[in-house]
């Protein structure tokens, strides 16, 4: 766990994480204040279900906050990324190194538990999100990589598009999802039995 500030400064000390968790809403308010002080047009943060319930409740209570909701149809790819990040504690891959090609060690049962959990999250969140009056938009993961996505997102936010906009992240593993696992054979069998063999193929 790492606290990342508006200026991308990182602090994974016990004191920083405890301070955030002790007062999550005050921490969030400070983030927005720092963002405003830097003079940026829009400031935001990545929030995942399970991060903090008080923040989730705050999002629903503040209609001025814009919500960009991302979900992923390929649950196998999603779980592969989750397990790899959890095992290595590397939650954001920003450079190419050995971590990119490292295989995931997981069984079909472990994957089944996780993907059903995340499918349930998405189902419940979509229902939670629908009645909110916040400005909001939903994208499926693959849409983020389509030509013109940055322009479309900027249009939604009402800000000028800059051609230099680019995510600092690099892809963590093979685009062919079954190649991400140390032992793909039982996983391949399992998902073909479920009629979800397409999850094993190229995602992008």
Task: Outline where the language-model segments fall.
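The conserved 3'-phosphoadenosine-5'-phosphosulfate
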Residues: 7-12, 126-198
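PAPS-dependent sulfotransferase catalytic domain
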Residues: 47-162
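PAPS-dependent sulfotransferase catalytic core
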Residues: 1-37, 173, 177-180
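Non-catalytic N-terminal targeting/anchoring module and adjacent flexible stem/linker
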Residues: 198-204
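Generic, ordered loop/turn and secondary-structure boundary motif
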Residues: 2-5, 43, 92, 145
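Short, basic, helix/turn surface patches
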Residues: 30, 97-104, 167, 192-195
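Loop/turn-to-beta-strand initiation segments
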Residues: 39-43, 66
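Residues that form generic nucleotide/phosphate-binding pockets
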Residues: 27-35, 58, 82, 114, ...
């Amino acid at each position: 766990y790492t606290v990342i500030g508006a200026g991308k400064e990182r602090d994974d000390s016990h004191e920083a994480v405890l301070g955030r968790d002790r007062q999550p809403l005050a921490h969030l308010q400070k983030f927005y204040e720092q963002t405003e002080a830097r003079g940026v047009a829009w400031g935001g943060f990545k929030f995942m279900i399970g991060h903090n319930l008080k923040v989730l409740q705050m999002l629903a209570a503040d209609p001025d906050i814009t919500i960009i909701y991302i979900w992923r149809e390929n649950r196998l790819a999603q779980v592969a990324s989750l397990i790899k990040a959890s095992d290595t504690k590397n939650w954001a891959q920003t450079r190419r190194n050995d971590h990119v090609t490292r295989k995931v060690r997981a069984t079909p049962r472990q994957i089944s538990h996780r993907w059903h959990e995340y499918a349930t999250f998405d189902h419940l969140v979509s229902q939670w999100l629908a009645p909110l009056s916040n400005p909001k938009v939903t994208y499926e993961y693959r849409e983020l990589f389509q030509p013109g996505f940055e322009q479309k997102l900027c249009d939604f936010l009402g800000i000028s598009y800059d051609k230099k906009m680019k995510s600092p992240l690099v892809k963590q593993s093979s685009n062919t999802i079954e190649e991400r696992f140390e032992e793909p054979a039982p996983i391949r069998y399992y998902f073909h039995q479920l009629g979800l063999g397409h999850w094993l193929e190229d995602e992008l």
